[in-house]
């Protein structure tokens, strides 16, 4: 209800920063069991893709997903829409 919104306590920037930090820590803890080569693999993939397409650093995501008895390497690359040459 819009009428009672002013009675709610506003979130402070400290609370927002704390929530974001908790998310980052949770992600780091979940990646702790993963192999050490994933960050290097991500950087090398980015370098190879940049030879052919002009992409952003955040365009390549590399994750290791445990699926039962198998580990699945999930690689996601967001390519630009147009003919963008390096």
From Swiss-Prot:
Gene3D superfamilies: Cell division topological specificity factor MinE. It comes from the Bacteria. The keyword Electron transport does not apply. Transmembrane segments: none annotated. GO terms for biological process: cell division; regulation of division septum assembly. The keyword Transcription does not apply. Keywords: Cell cycle, Cell division. Prevents the cell division inhibition by proteins MinC and MinD at internal division sites while permitting inhibition at polar sites. This ensures cell division at the proper site by restricting the formation of a division septum at the midpoint of the long axis of the cell. Belongs to the MinE family. This is Cell division topological specificity factor. It comes from Stenotrophomonas maltophilia (strain R551-3). The gene is minE.
């Amino acid at each position: 209800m819009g009428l009672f919104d002013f009675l709610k306590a506003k979130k402070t920037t400290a609370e927002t920063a704390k929530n974001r930090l908790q998310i980052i820590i949770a992600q780091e803890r979940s990646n702790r069991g993963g192999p050490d080569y994933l960050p290097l693999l991500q950087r090398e993939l980015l370098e190879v893709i940049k030879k052919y397409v002009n992409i952003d650093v955040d365009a390549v995501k590399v994750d290791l997903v445990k699926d039962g008895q198998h580990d699945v390497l999930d690689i996601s690359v967001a390519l630009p829409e147009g003919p963008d040459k390096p």
